[in-house]
Amino acid sequence: AGMDAALQAWGPLGEYLVDAAQRTILFWDVLRRRSDQYQEQKARAVPHVLSFGAELVLDGRTFEHPANYLLVRIIPPAGVVIDPKKRPFVVVDPRAGHGPGIGGFKADSELGVAMRAGHPSYFVGFTPDPMPGQTIEDIMRVEAVFLEKVIALHPEAEGKPCVIGNCQAGWAVMMVAAVRPELFGPLIIPGSPLSY
C-alpha cells in the first residue's frame, strides 16, 4: 500500500516508471528464454525445429563425395492418411538457418499441407558444419541421390517428386534440376534469389 501511495504521488511519471520496469523485466526474460533455446539447439548433433516425426532414409555424410545433408521421411501425424500412389513431396531446408521454418515447423507448413492432401513427404536437412572440403557440387550429387531414392521408394507414384526449395535451397535445387531434370516433377522455389 505504501508503494502504491508513493507511485500515485508521482502521477503519470510513476505509472510510466512501473510500466518501464515491468517491460524491461519481460524483455530480459524473453532474451534469457531465447538463449536457452539456442543452447539446446546447439547441443543437438542435427538441430531442427520440425514439428513432425521423421526417420532417416539416407545420410549424405556417408557418400563417396560426402556432404552434410540428410534425407528423412516425414511420419504423418495421427489421422493423416498417405496415398503411396500420389506424387511425393520433398522439401529442402534453406541453408540460411538450421530450421525448416515455413517448410515444416507447424501443421500449416509445406510438409503439413502436402501430407493432409495425402502425399508422401520427405525433408532434406543438414548438420551445422559442412564436411571437410565440401562443395556445392557435392551437395548437388547428394541431393540427386536423395531424389533417386525417393523415386525408387514410390515406383507407382503419379509423377516425379514435387521439390520445394525455400530461399537458398531454391537456387541449389535449380542447379540440380539443370543437370538432372529427369529427377523432378514440379519445382517450387519460394523466396529464391535467382535474378542477381
Give residue ranges: language-model regions.
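N-terminal cap/leader regions of alpha/beta-hydrolase-fold enzymes
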Residues: A1-Y196
